Amino acid sequence: MAKLTVVIPYYQKEPGILRRALASVFAQTLEDFHVLVIDDESPYPIADELAGLAQEERERITVIRQPNGGPGGARNTGLDNVPADSDFVAFLDSDDVWTPDHLLNAYQSMTRFDADCYWASITGGDAFYYHFGVADLEKSETVTRLSESPLVVELPELQDVMLKNWSFLHMSCMVIGRKLFEKVRFEATLKLAAEDVLFFCDCVLASKRVVLCDAAGAVRGEGLNIFHSIDNDSPQFLKQQFNTWVALDTLEGRYRNRPKAMEAIRSYKHTARRQALWSQARRIKRRKLPQFDLLARWLWRDPRLIGSAAELAVGKLSR
């Protein structure tokens, strides 16, 4: 049996969240794993979360403490510390939980079909209505079925499909092989958004084969989630949209020879610009100054921001 390393970035403010995630790890039907928890200066102390674990469980966990680096930085620390005898890395966000067969399904699918990268489906409550399962891809995309129970598929045009809508992919359902965990890393500077999507794309580009499993691998939780904690009126919203634009701009350089992917990327970039500008218009309406420093940085990177501002102004005046 191959050994897996579980990488969990930890930054939470409430008790019991990490403990719940770890309980789902130790309930796995495949038991050949070690756990790396990266304490990213979590406000709620990790020692309290580990206190109730059995001794044999505690011995299978390595805690690495670091200055706060955001989710991508924490996962990079995990990837940099994967034991030499590990063949796979499975990611789990500390506010999510795995279903019992997640690691077993991943291991069997990746070894049987010689895949470097694997995703399972994810489930969750009404707050995560936008997620959809792997089986739903068959309604609109060309899918090759590899096995029926559980349903495992591959998409010949995965790169184009995921850039059109990546809501069937989630970090807590992702498992990667040695070829990827030895060389692919997160863009740690993107702390507020899109570091996961950029990592997904880099892994797909570096893989000889990617397989997708319809069986749910994880259930989404509702702990502290940096992306979802920022609403349109948050002071951090503009930076979040800029992070998104930077990630998309990076992807544009990766996919210049794929017209469908480029079309999707440019559409998302346009949306990021418009949402950013609307947020600044709302600040003005509330008699607050726009965030000129970050707008200037964005404009320096992306002169098309002026065109988007003009479009919004014309649209406002024509009403």
Swiss-Prot record:
Keywords: Cell membrane, Exopolysaccharide synthesis, Glycosyltransferase, Membrane, Plasmid, Transferase
Membrane topology: Peripheral membrane protein
Catalytic class of the enzyme: transferase
Keyword Mitochondrion: no
Localization of this protein: Cell membrane
InterPro entries from the UniProt entry: Glyco_trans_2-like, Glycosyltransf_2, Nucleotide-diphossugar_trans
Protein's pathway: Glycan metabolism; exopolysaccharide biosynthesis
SUPFAM superfamilies: Nucleotide-diphospho-sugar transferases
Enzyme Commission no: 2.4.-.-
Listed Pfam families: Glycos_transf_2
GO CC annotations, alphabetized: plasma membrane
GO BP: polysaccharide biosynthetic process
MF (Gene Ontology): glycosyltransferase activity
Family to which this protein belongs: Belongs to the glycosyltransferase 2 family.
Function comment: Glycosyltransferase required for the synthesis of succinoglycan (EPS I). Needed for the addition of the seventh sugar (glucose), catalyzes the formation of a beta-1,3 linkage between the seventh and eighth sugar.
PANTHER family: GLYCOSYLTRANSFERASE, GLYCOSYLTRANSFERASE 2-LIKE DOMAIN-CONTAINING PROTEIN
Designated name of the protein: Succinoglycan biosynthesis protein ExoW
Organism of derivation: Rhizobium meliloti (strain 1021)
Record gene name: exoW
